[in-house]
Swiss-Prot record:
Gene responsible for this protein: eno
The protein's name: Enolase
Catalysis: reaction(s): (2R)-2-phosphoglycerate = phosphoenolpyruvate + H2O
Classification via InterPro entries: Enolase (IPR000941), Enolase-like_C_sf (IPR036849), Enolase-like_N (IPR029017), Enolase_C (IPR020810), Enolase_CS (IPR020809), Enolase_N (IPR020811)
Entry similarity comment: Belongs to the enolase family.
Annotated SMART domains: Enolase_C, Enolase_N
Length: 425
């Protein structure tokens, strides 16, 4: 009854107007699953590889080759398999690809099928996706990390850090957390506008004002939190995504916007000072992806009082995460399904983190779609934290809206993670 009888891949557009892969999976009993694959702007060197067409069509970014793989090689390999055998299906696709980075079939082709299979199996079982994947204990609604000021690769401004985020740690529900975020977002918009700044939004729905440095961005956010009637650090904490790999050159961190250069120790001390001066509770990619010594120094410096999240460092890869755990580097992993390229490997990364006492943060990409799968996965894994952009653009709000629905469905079983999500608070 849950055998796979049809798989259809197609080329659609993501939130940046670039092509991406969407996959439909149909089971013998008529159950159906659909998944669309996200794509990043600042990508780690160790990520699984997307299959793109090259050439002039869509300026080389077309995904017709990946769609052809879905409709051909992948369908031939898993047609007739039981959709409830997720691990076996994912392993079959990994083996079929045969490379270390999914570069043959393409992580975008494999992931689209992997997620669509899970959705079809969930429908066949009569369960919502979060319950099908997570079981009866899936009940924790994550604290959102809301990216309300953009810089770096996500914006055309002098700010070197990529994201400035607010975390409604003092809210009592996801519904209330979204309200907190929305009120601060709109207050910030007015304050930026009054100060003469542009209030257009970037890839992830945050503002991209022409500010001189990180402190200026943090000051605007702090003022907006207070103006909206909240207490910084108590109701709403702050977070950074430095995306430091993007400005790591020849062993140093080159801040072109500030016209400053910091060596790894100076970079770590700078982040420590920011975390001391502001209620910053989480810093993502504070050091570059291959600057393991810098990461170790930063972790030893502030890892006991600040969540240090590895994104480009770990790329949702359990093997790299285990290296980090062994070396005592970072204390959290960012989880992006397309970095590793299958649902099973994504879940394995979260489990590996939790077993080692590391936290895990479910995350979107800057190129998103209306697909809200990561909202379900955040609840399924009880990871307690999610990054899915600002409070604007429907590709971002789709995930918040899905979390609100899940909370409503769970009713009294639902628990908003709040401060407990960040073990150091």
């Amino acid at each position: 009854m849950t055998a796979i009888i049809d798989i259809v891949g197609r080329e659609i557009l993501d939130s940046r107007g670039n092509p991406t892969v969407e996959v439909d999976v149909v089971l013998e009993d008529g159950s159906f699953g659909r998944a669309a694959v996200p794509s990043g702007a600042s990508t780690g060197a160790h990520e699984a590889v997307e299959l793109r067409d090259g050439g002039s069509r869509y300026l080389g970014k077309g995904v017709e080759k990946a769609v052809e793989v879905v409709n051909g090689k992948i369908f031939d390999a898993i047609a007739g398999m039981d959709a409830e055998s997720q691990l076996l299906i994912d392993q079959t696709l990994i083996d079929l690809d045969g490379s270390a980075n999914k570069g043959n079939l393409g992580a975008n082709a494999i992931l689209g099928v992997s997620l669509a299979v899970a959705k079809a199996a969930a429908q066949a079982s009569g369960l919502p996706l979060y319950r099908y994947v997570g079981g009866t204990n899936a009940h924790v609604l994550p604290v959102p990390m809301m990216n309300i000021i953009n810089g770096g690769a996500h914006a055309d401004n002098p700010i070197d850090f990529q994201e400035f985020m607010i975390l409604p740690v003092g809210a009592t529900s996801i519904r209330e957390a979204v309200r907190y975020g929305s009120e601060v977002f709109h207050t910030l918009k007015k304050r930026l506008k009054d100060a003469g700044h542009n209030t257009n939004v970037g890839d992830e729905g945050g503002f991209a004002p022409n500010l001189k440095n990180a402190q200026a961005a943090l000051d605007f956010i702090m003022e907006s939190i207070e103006k909206a009637g909240f207490k910084p650090g108590e109701d709403i904490a702050l977070g950074l995504d430095c995306a430091a790999t993007e400005f790591f050159k020849d062993g140093n961190y080159v801040y072109e916007g500030e016209r400053k250069t910091r060596d790894p120790k100076a970079q770590a001390k700078y982040l420590a000072k920011l975390a001391s001066d502001y209620p910053i509770v989480t810093i993502e990619d504070g050091m570059a992806e291959d600057d393991w010594e810098g990461w170790k120094y930063l972790t030893d410096l502030i890892g006991n009082k600040c969540q240090l999240v590895g994104d480009d460092l770990f790329v949702t890869n359990s093997a790299r995460l285990r290296d980090g755990i062994r070396l005592g580097v970072a204390n959290s992993i960012l989880v992006k399904v397309n970095q590793i390229g299958s649902l099973s490997e994504t879940l394995d990364a979260v489990e590996t983190a939790h077993k080692a006492g590391y936290t895990a943060v479910m995350s979107h990409r800057s190129g998103e779609t209306e697909d809200s799968t990561i909202a379900d996965l955040a609840v399924a894994t009880n990871c307690g934290q999610i990054k899915t952009g600002s409070l604007a653009r429907s590709d971002r709000t789709a995930k918040y809206n899905q979390l609100i629905r899940i909370e409503e469905e769970l009713d009294k079983q639902a628990r908003y993670a709040g401060r407990s999500a960040l073990k150091l608070l």
